[in-house]
Structures are given as structure tokens and as C-alpha cells.
């Protein structure tokens, strides 16, 4: 293929997308995940000192769950990051409604009603995990080219920790996380960090990811062409609980030392999963190799989850650039 034909092919492969009106940066969806709480507060301080011009694009900052933040708890009544499905957002509010359901509906109205034309273009929801996951971007669609290109951009720029992409691939109406309210939302999950603690190194990684997201949006809106290519993603398959006593439901084992802190490793049949409190090893019985993540996450004990399992895929994303009058 000649150079001219190759260039023409690449040009034809480009996808033209509308400019992005801005981003909502949300912290404190879980009130004891403090990197996002302090980053949102710092961004609000910068805006107060320097005005909206501190960023090259419109940025909305949101402290998502202020009551939980004040009490440094994950939530008050129920996990708010499970309250953004269409069903929950349309639930009538009564005197007995959980605080987080009320707040989720407030945020839905603040950021644009989920599924409407006026919804926020992008939500970046900030989270910490006690698991050793580095920086993980979590979103709902394997065909959202904007989000995948931002993931790809962060992977090229951030070198201090692994940057991975996790796709949940749920129907958007069933998607229950805050970022699902927007057109191109994702969660930034950074760890390990204990609940109720802020670590400087983890905070810095989160801040760099937010700054780079804003930078990507500004460049995209300004006409930069982002070349396509392959993106390695992990797709959620299922959750695994701890071994339990069948009568009391108490745990009978902990995550095996050979698995602990090895999020996204390749897990094969026969590999150690758990070490029972009586000293026996429980091994993996999966038929195909999978990748565990959120290993021994502190917040998941109440949910009956020791870790999730994912399958690794390679997605090919097209080149993208902003849609203009000439390209429309």
C-alpha cells in the first residue's frame, strides 16, 4: 500500500464525535475514600482563588455524599454507588427513603437526568480501594470511543503505577454507578489505600489522572486527532465469595498469601485462592484462566465478595477527532 493510500485509509477510519461540554469531577461517593474527597476540596479551593479559568474546559466539582464524608463512613443508609440505575432513580421518595437514594436523585437532577439529551457529557467519579489495583478505570461500554481513548491516553502518560481498563458491559439503564448518569463516564479507582486514610502517593496518582483527563478533553475539543490502536481491557465475569460455614455463614478462610496483593494476575486452575483458618489451601477450580481484581477489598466483606474475576480482551479503537461543520 502506498503512503498516500495508507493515509487515506486512516482518514476514512477516523470517527468524528461532538465536542465535550466539560467534565464533572465527583469525590466522596463513598465517604471514607479520602483521595477523592481531598482532591475535590482542593479543586474547589483553586477555583475560589483563581476563578473558572483555572482549567481550559468547564469543570464541575461535586462532593457526592457529604453526610458520609462528614462522618468518614462509606455510606449512611445504603451504598450510594449502587443507587444510579434507572429503577432506583425513578423510585418515589418517601419519609423512609434511604439518604443515599435521596442524594442520588439530587445528583441525577444536578448533572442532567440519566438518559436525557441534557445530561453531563462526562463524569469522572473518584474512588479508593484497599486492594492493590494501581490505577483502574472502570466504565460500562466497550464501544465508547471517548472513554477508551482517555484510558489509552492515561496509559501512555502515567508510569508510576499500572493503568488498567475494566469494562462492566451492563445495559446503561441497569448500570448503577454514578458515572453511568453521563454520556461518557468512568470511575477512577486508585489503591491500595486504607479506608479513612489519605496517602500522598495515592492522592498524587489520582490528581495526575484527573489533570490528564481534563488535558485530553481540551486537546480533543481543540481539534487534536487521537490515533486509533489496540487497548487491553478486562471484562467482568463474576464474583467469588470467601469459604463460609454453611450454618453460621462465618468466614472459614482468608485470601491466600500467594494471591494477596496480586490484582489482575493470571489465575489458573489449581492456583491457591484461600488459606483456611485450620491451615488448608483452597485452590482455583475455574476451567479457563481469569484475572482476579478487588482482591480482599475491605468494603466487600459485607457484600460477600472476596474478589471479582475478569477476562482479558484486546479492543481495537478507531482514530477520533472533534466533529466540525466541515466534518459533519
Curated annotation (Swiss-Prot):
Sequence positions that bind substrate: 74, 81-82, 189, 300
Taxonomy, superkingdom: Eukaryota
Binding site for Zn(2+): 30, 33, 127
Pfam families (UniProt xref): AstE_AspA_cat, AstE_AspA_hybrid
Any one Gene Ontology molecular-function term assigned to this protein's record: hydrolase activity, acting on ester bonds
Keyword annotations: Cell membrane, Cytoplasm, Hydrolase, Membrane, Metal-binding, Zinc
Localization, UniProt: Apical cell membrane; Cytoplasm
Membrane-crossing residue ranges in chain numbering: none
GO CC field: apical plasma membrane; cytosol
Primary location: membrane
Gene3D superfamilies xref list: 2.20.25.160, Zn peptidases
Reaction catalysed by this enzyme: an N-acyl-aromatic L-alpha-amino acid + H2O = an aromatic L-alpha-amino acid + a carboxylate; an N-acetyl-L-cysteine-S-conjugate + H2O = an S-substituted L-cysteine + acetate
EC number: 3.5.1.114
InterPro entries in the record: AspA/AstE_fam, Aspartoacylase, AstE_AspA_cat, Aste_AspA_hybrid_dom
Needed co-factor(s): Zn(2+)
Function description: Plays an important role in deacetylating mercapturic acids in kidney proximal tubules.
Subunit structure comment from the entry: Homotetramer.
Protein family membership: Belongs to the AspA/AstE family. Aspartoacylase subfamily.
Full protein name: N-acyl-aromatic-L-amino acid amidohydrolase (carboxylate-forming) A
